[in-house]
Each structure stands twice: as C-alpha cells, then as structure tokens.
From Swiss-Prot:
GO cellular component terms, semicolon-separated: axonemal A tubule inner sheath; axonemal microtubule; motile cilium; sperm flagellum
Cell compartments where the protein resides: Cytoplasm, Cytoskeleton, Cilium axoneme; Cytoplasm, Cytoskeleton, Flagellum axoneme
Subunit structure: Microtubule inner protein component of sperm flagellar doublet microtubules.
Protein name as catalogued: Cilia- and flagella-associated protein 161
Signal peptide (UniProt feature, chain positions): none
Keywords, in A-Z order: Cell projection, Cilium, Cytoplasm, Cytoskeleton, Flagellum
Region (Disordered): 275-321
Cross-referenced Pfam families: CFAP161
Record's function text: Microtubule inner protein (MIP) part of the dynein-decorated doublet microtubules (DMTs) in cilia axoneme, which is required for motile cilia beating.
Cross-referenced PANTHER family: CILIA- AND FLAGELLA-ASSOCIATED PROTEIN 161 (PTHR24274:SF1)
Source species: Bos taurus
InterPro entries, alphabetized: CF161
Superkingdom, natural source: Eukaryota
Length: 321
C-alpha cells in the first residue's frame, strides 16, 4: 500500500507557482469588483435599469401628444387559432440578449422585443412618442401622421427606436419567420409608424383626427405597410421568463378586417396617485348591469313595484257600478 512519507508541513510539487497563481486570481477578482465588472454586478445593474419604475404621462384631454410616455398594450382577446397562449393584456417590452448583456455595460444594438404580462410601467416597457417630421412637442398625434417610438430601457444616456425592415433569408422573427421588429439607435425612415382606425369603413373619415388614449388602434410600419402584431401562441424564453413574440404582419379575416391580434392601445398614466395606468381604473357598470341591479332590488322589495316614478303611475282600482 502507498504510504505518505511526508509530514503535513512539507510542500510537494510546484507549490510556489500555485501560491502566486492564487494571489493573481484574488488580485484580478478585487480589481474587477472595484470597477463593477463582475457578472453579478452587471446582472444586478441591468435588472435595476430595466425594472426601474417609470411615470407615464397623464392625458388631460384624452388624446395622445408628441413627447408623451406611454405603454403599448395588446388588449386581451380570445385566441381561436391555438389552445396554448398567453392570456390577458400584453405590453410591448424590450428584451436584451442575456449573454450579450453580461459582456457589455451598454444595451445591445439591435435589441429584441417581446410581449409580457405586465401592467406596471418600468424601464423596459415605457415608450416615448417622438416627432418624425418636425412636429412640436406637445402637439396632438393624429391618424395617418408619422411618429417614432423611443425607449431608454431605464438608461439616461441612450435612446433606442422601434424599427422594422423587409424580411430576408437571414433576418426574420425567431418563431413565425415573419418580418422582424427590433430596437436600434439609428434614426432613419425605418423608425416611422402610423396610427390607423380599426374599422376599415370608417378609416378614411377618421384620417387626420386626434388619436385617443387608451383605445384600440392599429400601428402600421410606414416603410413596409405591415401592422404590429403580438403572437400570443408563440413563446420566447427571455431574460425575464416566458413571453410572446412580436412581429410586423397584418392579419385579415374573410371580410378584409384586421384581426384582434393587430390591435394595440397607447396607455397613459392615471391621474390618481395610487394607480399607475388607466388600465387600473375601475370600469363603470354597464347599462345591462344597472338593469339587473334594478330588477334585483324590485324582487327583494315588492313594495317598490307600486312606487310611482317618471315612467308611469300606480294603477288604480275601479269600483263596480
């Protein structure tokens, strides 16, 4: 049997080189920690910026203006083409590549996009309505007017623009292989978008009218004439979990009307301090709900039926002659 002939204090092998190597590794680790270049530090910094709480613009007149900070939300609708999909309202979010984000202190360009189940305005889903042809900040956005959508991602020194271009063999969306939508820092004609009224028969009548906030609209790319769409049934594994794919494609039904997957809302902030967006406001009761409440009150209180109101009077009994 092998027997250890040396005591615990005896050093064997290249012990001197191993000591110097451990010292160099520790010095390199401390230097990266002081500069903030460790992987955990970059990961924490990226999440802090992308998930930084943002304040949306409050619309006083109910319309969208240039310079407003909004969220692009795909309203909830039943998905009939697939059994497995993401339900609820989906907001357009920037999705940087996890590996590339850890190798650099800045956001990658171009940067990907996805649709996530979040209604809280943060750095990764808060967009700014920017001018495209010399419009004035604060001017009302109108149907058929060009505009740009910019996002900072929580960073203060960089602006990325929502862009798209024609599909090629080397450049397309990851799951559907349709026209890709991405974020870039270049200010060009690929950044221009237009808002259109959802109903095709009333679209020309609403041309030039102000775009209302928190209502369904169509967002079309000016260069390719493709509509922004959220594929709820196509999932992406992103830095923040499972989210839906976003592309540029117009889906039409048998009546040549855009499908609900092409509908979007420009969501603004709520005037109440305890709410973040207008989607958090409680909805007023509908007319049919009020009618049901009145019927329930009459059933619970039979004497209320004989109470006179503005619609009629109490029937009177006639004595026999």
């Amino acid at each position: 049997m092998a027997q250890n002939l040396y005591g615990p204090r005896v050093r064997i092998g290249n012990w001197n080189e191993d000591v110097y190597l451990e010292e160099e590794i520790m010095k390199d680790f401390l230097a990266k920690r002081d500069k903030g270049q460790l992987l955990i530090q970059r990961n924490r910094r990226l999440k802090e910026n992308l998930l930084r709480p943002m304040q949306l613009s409050v619309s006083e007149d109910g319309y969208i203006h240039y310079g407003d900070k909004v969220m692009l939300v795909s309203p909830d609708h039943p998905e009939t083409e697939a059994d497995l999909f993401l339900p609820g309202d989906l907001s357009l979010c920037m999705t940087p590549d996890e590996i590339k984000a850890h190798l650099s202190n800045e956001l990658e360009v171009p940067c990907g996009l996805s649709a996530a189940q979040t209604k809280i305005p943060v750095g990764r889903n808060t967009f700014t309505i920017l001018c495209a042809a010399g419009e004035v900040i604060g001017q009302v956005l109108r149907y058929g007017q060009n505009f740009r959508l910019g996002i900072t991602g929580g960073f203060d020194d960089r602006m990325l623009y929502l862009s798209s271009d024609h599909r090629t063999l080397l450049k397309s969306s990851k799951r559907s292989w349709l026209q890709e939508v991405f974020l870039t820092h270049e200010d060009s004609y690929l950044n221009c978008w237009q808002a259109a009224f959802p109903h095709p028969q009333l679209r020309l009548e609403y041309e030039g009218s102000p775009v209302p906030a928190n209502t369904k609209i169509l967002i079309t790319h000016c260069h390719t004439n493709r509509g922004l769409v959220a594929h709820r049934h196509l999932f992406l594994r992103t830095y923040f979990g499972q989210e839906a794919e976003v592309a540029a494609h117009t889906y039409l039904d048998s009546h040549r009307v855009e499908k609900p997957k092409n509908h979007w809302m420009l969501v603004t902030g709520a005037p109440r301090k305890d709410l973040s967006t207008m989607l958090d406001l409680p909805k007023p009761p509908a007319e049919d709900t009020r009618a049901l409440e009145q019927e329930r009150e009459q059933v619970s209180d039979p004497g209320a039926r004989s109470t006179p109101d503005a619609r009629g009077c109490v029937p009177q009994c006639t004595l026999p002659m």
